[in-house]
Amino acid sequence: SGSKTAKIGDGCFGVRLDRIGSTSGMGCGGVPKPTPGGS
């Protein structure tokens, strides 16, 4: 958080999508790496 860089676990919207967004591919560019915690 803080940077506009999309990290694994954080959506491009700046909202923490946790595993829901990660597994759904809602991550920035559809990150194919679902985080086990979302942190």
Swiss-Prot record:
Proregion residues excised on maturation: 1-8
InterPro entries according to UniProt: Natr_peptide, Natr_peptide_CS, Natriuretic_peptide_brain
Tissues where this protein is expressed: Expressed by the venom gland.
Cellular localisation: Secreted
Entry keyword set: Disulfide bond, Hypotensive agent, Secreted, Toxin, Vasoactive, Vasodilator
Keyword Nucleotide-binding: no
GO function terms (MF aspect): hormone activity; toxin activity
Main location: secreted
Single biological process term from Gene Ontology: regulation of blood pressure
PROSITE patterns membership: NATRIURETIC_PEPTIDE
A cellular component annotation (GO) from this entry: extracellular region
A Pfam family matched in the record: ANP
Disulfide bond annotation, renumbered to this chain: 12-28
Highest taxon of the lineage: Eukaryota
Purpose of the protein: Snake venom natriuretic peptide that targets both NPR1 and NPR2. Exhibits hypotensive and vasodepressor activities.
Family: Belongs to the natriuretic peptide family.
Entry protein name: Natriuretic peptide HsNP-a
Organism: Hoplocephalus stephensii (Stephens's banded snake)
Taxonomic classification: Eukaryota, Metazoa, Chordata, Craniata, Vertebrata
